[in-house]
A protein has these predicted regions:
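N-terminal glycine-rich FAD/FM-binding segment characteristic of electron-transfer flavoproteins
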Residues: 1-225
Length: 225
């Protein structure tokens, strides 16, 4: 983490956290926030993040913007209201995400509560070039995790093995949408992708028509590539 810009790494190491469960993870992350009081808390918009993020935001009584596709630091409101310029707040986290089924883009801020929380789609942020020789201050933090009636007991973990290609790893994508017309016609795109050494991807319309699985969807409501 240090080589990618982290100055401090907070480690919570507890056997209870070996396998993800909402309650102990929420307790741990809530304790980290209460102890270190960050201005911003980002969580990956993964299956775990979409469960953990809202739970933690409710416990620390702040807002959360889900599935963000862009993050910026700026002023809120974006344009000062005439006569109320002194009410404009600076250095706010501006969180952009698709809304209304991807038909519009909304920019959201959380000016009155901290931390400012967001879940961010994988692939949105580009890693910086590694900083050779960088070191981070590693802090071990051991909050008390109390077992309560929200705990669940894991009986068995079954790992599914899928054969779906990860389009986020592709250097070349051949993408099709509604105009392709059918699942069969995507075979032509697959042939072209094979020639180019790439993969096939698609739009939301193709997924809704059942032509390709959602794993291949790109765009505001799909994967960021």
């Amino acid at each position: 983490l240090a080589v990618y810009g982290a100055d401090k790494v907070i480690v919570v190491d507890n056997p209870v956290l070996e396998t993800y469960r909402t309650e102990p993870y929420a307790q741990a992350l809530t304790a980290v926030i209460n102890e270190y009081k960050p201005e911003i808390m980002l969580v990956g918009a993964t299956a775990i993040g979409r469960d953990l993020g809202p739970t933690v935001s409710a416990r620390v009584q702040t807002g959360l913007t889900a599935d963000c596709t862009m993050l910026e630091i700026g002023d809120f409101p974006l344009v000062a209201v005439p006569g109320k310029e002194d009410e404009q707040k600076h250095n706010q986290l501006l969180m952009t995400r698709p809304a209304f089924g991807g038909n519009t883009i909304a920019t959201i801020a959380c000016p009155d509560n901290r931390p400012q929380m967001a879940t961010v789609r994988p692939g949105v942020m580009q890693k910086i070039a590694p900083i050779e020789g960088a070191k981070a201050n590693v802090v071990e933090f051991n909050p008390e995790l109390k077992e309560n009636n929200k705990y669940v007991e894991i009986e068995e973990v079954v790992k599914a093995v899928g054969n779906v290609e990860n389009i986020m790893d592709a250097k070349i994508l051949v993408s099709g949408g509604r105009g392709v017309g059918s699942a069969e016609n995507f075979g032509m795109l697959k042939e072209l992708a094979d020639v180019l050494g790439g993969m096939v991807s698609c739009s939301r319309a193709a997924v809704e028509n059942g032509w390709l699985a959602q794993d291949y969807q790109v765009g505001q409501t799909g994967k960021t590539v």
